[in-house]
Amino acid sequence: MIKKDTQGVTFAKGFTAAGVKAGIKKSGNLDVAVIYTKTQAVVAGTFTQNKVAAAPVYVSKEVVATGTAHAIVANAGCANACTGQQGLDDAHKMAQIAADELGVNADDVIVGSTGVIGVNLPMDKLEAGIKDAVANLSADGLSLIHISEPTRLALIS
C-alpha cells in the first residue's frame, strides 16, 4: 500500500514551515512562506542560466555555495527581478529579517521570489509576513499545502 504524504515540506524530521497572507499578492492568497530547521541542513541548488536573473537568485547562490542553510524564505506576487541594486538590497534584507526572527545568520537563509517583474518588494508587507510566518512555524506543514502549486514548487525547489 502506498501512503500519501500530506505533510509536505515538513515530512522530514526537524523541519517546520508556515505560509501566510501578507498582502503582497493582489488575489489575497498566501504569499509568504518560511521553511526552517534548527539543525543546519546540507543544501544544493539549480539556478537559471540566463544572463538576467532576479536578485534572490544572486543572494541564494551565495548561500548555496556554503553548502548549508537553516531556512528558506520566499514570497509570491513580486519577483524582485530587474530591480537593480535596490532589489539586491531588498533580497539581503529579506534574508536578514528571517535570520533575526529565527536566531540564525543571514548567510544561512535562502531567499526566493516569484511574481511581477520590474517591481520592488513591498518590504513593509514582506517583513510583517516573515514575522507572522516565523511565529506560526509548525511541524505539520499544513499551512503550506494551501499555497498555489506553482508557488509551492518554487518554494521547495
Task: Label the model's feature ranges.
Residues 35-68:
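Active-site-flanking structural segment that lines cofactor/substrate pockets
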Residues 121-144:
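Glycine-rich and small/hydrophobic secondary-structure elements
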Residues 1-48:
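N-terminal amphipathic/basic leader segments beginning at the initiator methionine
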Residues 81, 96-102, 111-127:
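Hydrophobic alpha-helical hairpins/lids featuring a short glycine-rich hinge
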Residues 28-31, 52-54, 66-71, 104-108, ...:
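Short coil/turn connectors at secondary-structure junctions
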Residues 145-157:
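Single conserved hydrophobic/aromatic residue that forms the stacking wall/gate
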Residues 35-36, 73-75, 111-113:
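Short beta-strand segments
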Residues 73-102:
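Alpha-helical support elements that line or immediately flank enzyme active sites
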